[in-house]
Design a protein with these regions (language model features):
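Short coil-to-beta transition motif at edge beta-strands of beta-rich domains
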Residues: 2-17
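Exposed beta-strand and adjacent loop surfaces of beta-rich binding modules
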Residues: 9, 23, 35
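Short coil-to-beta-strand transition motifs
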Residues: 15-25
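Basic/aromatic-rich interaction segments and small domains that mediate binding to polyanionic partners
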Residues: 27-48
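Intrinsically disordered, low-complexity, charged/polar segments
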Residues: 43-69
Length: 69
């Protein structure tokens, strides 16, 4: 499957708050490095890279925007 299509603009919820936020969207896919550039929906300046293996780890990330209480 084309990684660009699978991950680009996908939405994710972080189990733990990162820089104060949980809800992120994929802005860029770096296929060679197997990394995603994600940004916080509430603070678009809050961006960083995440390994694709980490984003698929359900103990760290959930697909979509989920409410975590």
């Amino acid at each position: 499957m084309n990684l660009m299509k699978k991950y680009l603009h996908s939405k994710w919820t972080s189990i733990e708050k990162l820089n104060g936020w949980r809800h992120y969207e994929v802005r860029n896919v770096f296929i060679n490095n197997k990394e995603l550039e994600i940004f916080s929906i509430c603070d678009k300046k809050n961006t960083f890279r995440v390994k694709i293996t980490d984003i698929n780890d359900n103990s760290k990330w959930l697909p979509g925007w989920e409410e975590i209480v």
